Design a protein with these regions (language model features):
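Conserved, well-structured interaction surfaces
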Residues: 46-52, 59, 84-161, 181-198, ...
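Bacterial N-terminal signal peptides that target proteins for export
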Residues: 2-13
Length: 602
């Protein structure tokens, strides 16, 4: 993606071009402010500048860092008192004017750039050769529509909701660029959620139709391509120039299929199902389409649990994704995550503290929930015989961490260092746990060493998509229904990868397979575990209309004469109001545009 990003750095001329539509009272919708003005005619004869207009939309995708909005759920808390997600859980702290998960401005601005690009793409002289020009134009149209679909998904997830009359609304569904002559009071009207989903699906399906599944070089000397309603025979050099591996990282047909799976699962979920026009059967169909490209069940990566710790990451080229990863950011060598989230004894700030709630979600090694007597869970030895993923994803008392395999003591009576419970309000754990997932354990943060390693952020992982399919298929067809493979088949494979069960069997899974309701509970729990700390649970709880106010808990461990004493503790309340299944429209937008309707309760 290096070549892609370099084109976006042409300068303010490119970014200003897209915004030369004129900004009046709508400046905040279409940032940044104009610094340079070039007429559209300049763009028509300079493809790099046209590319930069669409490039601005790319730069508005999540920037490669994790949000860790998990600290606003029952999965984690933060020891940083200034953390926006920590503060949003307070009484009346999440408001329409103070919204850490607001995406309105960024996504609406991205769509404005996209619409501007689409309105002019056919006027750009991409190349003097007719075939090359048609190939470029079709690819760019597919990219733009795919990007518009993903930004619509982000908008609906964060701002779709019920109005005071109980009508499920989406966002303004604008398909044309706005300019100084636009009537914003008529444009700034929220379309129905269903209409927004129809447009999202249409855009993403168009991207699937016209884009290559992946950008890969071909070895065929000639190829026939169909572009803009005509067929062309092109050489290998021409094909690779327009659709080859140099463009890996840009929106592709595979990514479009994944967005369809993500968005339709959201729309079919309890919070949106009544007004989205989308069914679980549709969501299952879209998820299966992308999983089939990955080989179905056999495509589940056996090393997918710790994709972030791949020692060969440094050798990844820009055109490569590991087996677990469908779409990723560029890799970079740093220690940013480790500096923030390692325990303090190994020079970290310990910012994310997993909760006892999340720890309890990990089953026993035999696959049974620890609340089930068949798990043989021992409260006096709570970390023994547990799901192997617990030790991979969470640092609990006595575990090792870091390049030196330091033993981490999280006990409340730890007198040795700051790793103990509440030893230092700015660095120590508040729950008795530290986050381990996403962190490289081969980094030494000692200031005399300042070690670094390669990282990237997975924008979309296959594990998410397998879980998407399992959830949708269970709701549509039951645990063992479906075409080709079932929800049961997916969950069986995921739990086998985790190392759950005994004697080659998973008796708890077999129990759940007899009931859609029990399988639903299991699928949701597997999703919670597999995707923890990646920003999913905040949105999952809302689309499921699940409990948002479960108290975050921790574990205090002390030494007693009879051995270690484990005492559950209350750490933090969750004070979300009843309307918090849906996020608000920004307050200033409601003030600026009387035609905009706010979601109920905000």
């Amino acid at each position: 993606m290096n070549n892609l990003l370099s084109k976006y750095k042409i300068g303010g001329v490119v970014l200003g071009l897209a915004l030369s539509i004129g900004l009046t009272s709508c400046d905040d919708m279409f940032e940044p402010a104009i610094e340079n003005h070039l007429g559209f005619e300049y763009m028509y004869d300079h493809p790099d500048y046209a590319d930069g207009v669409l490039g601005n939309a790319y730069t508005r995708l999540p920037n490669g860092s994790y949000s860790f909005n998990d600290v606003a759920t029952d999965d984690a808390v933060s020891n940083d008192a200034t953390d926006a997600y920590r503060k949003m859980t307070g009484v009346d702290s999440w408001t329409s004017s103070n919204n850490p998960v607001e995406t309105w401005r960024n996504c609406r601005a991205a769509i404005q750039y996209i619409n501007l690009f689409l309105a002019n793409v056919d006027k750009v002289n991409w190349n003097s050769d007719e075939a090359v020009r048609a190939m470029y134009e079709q690819r760019y149209i597919g990219e733009a529509k795919g990007l518009r679909a993903i930004f619509m998904y982000y908008l609906l997830r964060a701002h779709g909701g019920l109005d005071a009359n109980g009508t499920l609304l989406g966002v303004p569904n604008t398909l044309e660029p706005s300019d100084v002559s636009s009537d914003f009071n008529s444009l700034e009207v929220r379309a129905s959620f269903a209409d927004c989903m129809k447009q999202l699906i249409a855009d993403a399906e168009e991207a699937v139709r016209v884009l290559p599944v992946d950008y890969k070089d071909t070895d065929n000397e000639t190829m026939t391509v169909s572009c803009l309603g005509k067929s062309y025979t092109v050489t290998k050099t021409t094909y690779n120039r327009v659709l080859g591996s140099n463009f890996a990282g840009r929106f592709s047909g595979r990514i479009a299929r994944a967005v369809l799976a993500q968005a339709t699962l959201m729309a079919a979920s309890p919070a949106f199902a009544s007004g989205s026009g989308v069914t679980y059967e549709q969501a299952a169909k879209y998820a299966k389409a992308v999983l089939d490209l990955n080989g179905g069940i056999s495509g589940i990566d056996t090393n997918g649990l710790e994709w972030y710790a791949d020692p060969n990451m440094k050798d990844l080229t820009a055109a490569q994704c590991p087996k677990e990863v469908l779409w990723r950011t560029e890799k970079s060598e740093n220690n940013d995550l480790e500096t923030k989230y390692y325990p303090p004894s190994i020079y970290g700030q310990g910012r994310i503290n997993p909760t006892q709630n999340l720890v309890d979600a990990f089953p026993a090694a035999n696959g049974y929930p620890i609340t089930d007597a068949k798990s043989e869970y021992d409260p006096a030895n709570p970390y023994a015989n547990r799901d192997p993923r617990l030790a991979k994803y969470i640092i609990y008392n006595g575990q090792t961490a870091g390049s030196g395999n330091a033993v981490i003591n999280t006990q409340a009576d730890n007198a040795t260092n700051l790793d103990g419970l509440n030893k230092d309000v700015s660095k120590s754990t508040r729950t008795g746990y530290y986050m381990k997932k996403l962190l490289r354990q081969d980094i030494n943060l000692d200031p005399t060493v300042n070690g670094k390693a390669y990282h990237y952020t997975a924008r979309i992982r296959y594990t998410e998509l397998y879980l998407d399919y399992a959830e949708a298929a269970n709701e549509a067809y039951g645990p063992k229904g479906g075409t080709g493979y079932s929800a049961y088949d997916v969950i069986k494979a995921i739990r086998e990868r985790a190392g759950l069960g005994e004697f080659g069997e998973d008796p708890y899974l077999e129990e759940c397979a007899k009931s859609k309701e029990k399988m639903r509970e299991l699928i949701r729990n597997e999703r919670r575990i597999e995707l923890c700390f990646e920003g999913f649970r905040f949105w999952d709880l809302r689309r499921w209309k699940a409990n948002l106010t479960e108290e975050a808990k921790g574990m205090s461990i002390t030494n007693e004469e009879a051995g270690k004493k484990y005492t559950p503790i209350s750490v933090e309340t969750r004070n979300f109001k009843k309307d918090a299944f849906y996020g608000p429209v920004p307050y200033d937008q409601i003030l600026n545009f009387p035609s905009l309707v706010q979601n109920a309760g905000w």
